[in-house]
């Protein structure tokens, strides 16, 4: 298991550490439900440094390279901005999703945990000699503050500094130790939030300062488990569970967010252009509400049927503490994926109705 950069720091806060995709991760600080409530009701600080971080340098050449590799418009050098995007193969299948941050003269690719070797091989095999691609897991960390009052926490930390107002906009801040950090407006759980990209050496000072502010504002540290529950409740699919290489990008419901409407030269464009119309897609990722009386949540691959015909399958599920309901994601054939349709979920031990609902899930619990 690969160690987390700030492992000892978190142990001082009584963190529960375990593995996500063979990477050490802060799972919780001992009270997942309280941490989740802090994220959704006020705000919480989460260490996302278990995720893959890759640095790409090469000035204009790096920008041109990433523009070809990724589906969305990459921030220009020196813009200090971010985008959410896909990396595709020529068949239009998703290799990974990622956030790509411009950090002055370099780019940081932030992807799902455990993807370092795969993405390094993929990027290095296509990069020219004037582009450097390296593993940044040991040198760069990612913290995120998520929740309705996330901005209040940052304002209390960065007195007088102007924060990025628009989603995916960013600002560079110089810390008292002379190190610079990147602050990005990035609502990862649907209620507002900011990422903090910092050198590993600066992390402990940042966390300790923010910890004091959290306490003063009745907020707390939160682990990956609470963060992932909030992410699910916000209707945001996760790579490895709801998005994987078997899926064409346009089937995920994320095309508007992750794919440029003007670029035509990225890998996989020809396939994506043929599947831009919903009628051309075989299936589509939908949210599902399951009946409350089921005893066991469905597993990835459990089938969805309509009139005894298999029309889809489950990708992930959750007993939501926020909505007090059983929820799921699943891919459903285009002829049966209308909002409101009621399907039959067939699991190993039971069958149950499953209703297709709008995303984000909050729209169904007004």
Q: Where would I find each of the regions flagged by the language model?
A:
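Glycine-rich, acidic
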Residues: 3-29, 132-285, 289, 298
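Helix N-cap motif at beta-to-alpha junctions
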Residues: 59-60, 112-117, 148-151, 199-204, ...
């Amino acid at each position: 298991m690969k160690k987390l950069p700030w492992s000892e720091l978190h142990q001082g806060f009584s963190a529960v550490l375990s593995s996500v995709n063979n990477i050490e991760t802060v799972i919780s600080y001992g009270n997942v439900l309280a941490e989740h409530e802090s994220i959704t009701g006020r705000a919480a600080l989460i260490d996302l440094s278990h995720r893959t971080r890759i640095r790409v340098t090469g000035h204009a050449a790096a920008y041109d390279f990433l523009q070809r590799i990724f589906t969305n418009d990459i921030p220009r050098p020196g813009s200090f901005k971010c985008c959410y995007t896909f990396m595709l193969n020529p068949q239009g299948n998703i290799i990974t999703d990622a956030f790509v941050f411009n950090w002055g003269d370099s780019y940081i690719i932030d992807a799902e945990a455990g993807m370092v070797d795969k993405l390094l091989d993929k990027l290095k095999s296509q990069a020219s000699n004037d582009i450097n691609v390296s593993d940044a897991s040991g040198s760069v960390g990612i913290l995120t503050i998520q929740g309705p009052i996330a901005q209040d926490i940052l304002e209390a930390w960065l007195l007088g500094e102007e924060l990025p107002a628009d989603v995916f906009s960013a600002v560079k801040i110089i810390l008292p130790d002379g190190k610079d950090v990147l602050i990005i407006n990035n609502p990862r759980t649907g209620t507002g939030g900011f990422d903090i990209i910092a050198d590993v050496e600066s992390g402990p000072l940042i966390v300790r300062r923010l910890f004091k502010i959290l306490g003063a504002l009745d907020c707390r540290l939160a682990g990956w488990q609470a963060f992932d529950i909030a992410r699910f409740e916000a209707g945001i699919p996760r790579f490895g569970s709801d998005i994987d290489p078997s899926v064409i990008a346009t089937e995920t419901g994320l095309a508007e967010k992750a794919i440029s409407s003007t670029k035509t030269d990225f890998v996989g464009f020809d396939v994506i252009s043929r599947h831009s119309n919903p009628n051309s897609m075989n299936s589509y990722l939908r949210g599902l509400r399951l009946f409350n009386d089921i005893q066991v949540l469905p597993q990835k691959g459990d089938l969805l049927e309509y009139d005894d015909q298999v029309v889809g399958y489950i990708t992930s599920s959750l007993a939501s503490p926020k909505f007090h309901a059983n929820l799921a994601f699943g891919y459903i054939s285009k002829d049966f994926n209308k909002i409101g349709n009621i399907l039959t979920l067939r699991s190993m031990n039971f069958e149950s109705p499953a209703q297709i609902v709008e995303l984000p899930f909050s729209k169904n619990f007004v």
